[in-house]
Amino acid sequence: MIINKKRVILFVFFALILLIAAVAVWFFQFNPTGYRMSVSCRASFEKISDNVFVNRNYAGNRDDIAALIDEAIARDTDFFGSLVCRDHTVIIICDDEKLLAKLGGDHDTQTVLFPVKKSCISVSTEYLNVDVLAHELTHAELHERLSGKALRRIPTWFDEGIALQNDYREQYSSETWAEQTDNGKHTVAHEDMDTGAEFYSGTKEDRRFRYLNAKHDVSEWLENHGLQDFMNLIDRLNGGEDFRAAYGS
């Protein structure tokens, strides 16, 4: 009986090790978030500066990447006053379609909270411009300033609305908003774009219209409240206050 018990314990022990190993392989090899987190360890990518990586066979000019990132950082620094996210943010530039599929996006930011908070930005050459980089870095900065609990509770329209403040593309301009909403007569209610499932659903035009509304609404809030109130809002959210109560006051 003692021998059988030892065998059972050993079997369970090794089964757990195999299970953990299998989960780790799945996460880092087949899950986009895990794949991004492990880019620094992959032979398919190379580091070109601190926390900036490109696929090894990248056909573009690496100096152009550095210049665009510097411009985006300057834009975001002007907005926030300073950036605290850079040490915990990885930027991945990729022009390989197969690798982009593994990264799970060609112009987006994924933020993980465990074991430490870290944002991984993936951008393809199609979207490699200062507006997209500034947009994604704004996500990373906002996520860095918010606690994990507060980050999970903010609505998607607010997250995107803040990021769009540093995205100057014409498709999200105030003139475009006025034209497409008939000067605000036809807009999207906040409660209809609270979640990612709501915000990113539908056609490209549907999503773009929500982006447009999110930018306009957050722009108006910032004009009425200013940067200091925005920073106070972050503090209040980190303190556990309900988003709608804090944002509406």
Which residues does each predicted region cover?
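N-terminal Sec-pathway targeting helices
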Residues: 1-21
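Membrane-interface motif at the C-terminal end of an N-terminal transmembrane signal
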Residues: 18-40
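Short, exposed beta-strand/loop patches in secreted or surface proteins that constitute
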Residues: 43-47, 109-116, 124
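Acidic/histidine-rich, surface-exposed loop or edge segments in extracytoplasmic proteins
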Residues: 45-62
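Auxiliary, metal-adjacent structural segments of Zn-dependent hydrolase domains
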Residues: 64-117
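Short pre-active-site segment immediately N-terminal to the catalytic Zn-binding motif
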Residues: 117-133, 148-154
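Acidic/His/Gly-enriched intrinsically disordered linker/tail segments
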Residues: 132, 150-216, 222-249
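Active-site-flanking alpha-helical
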Residues: 138-146, 167
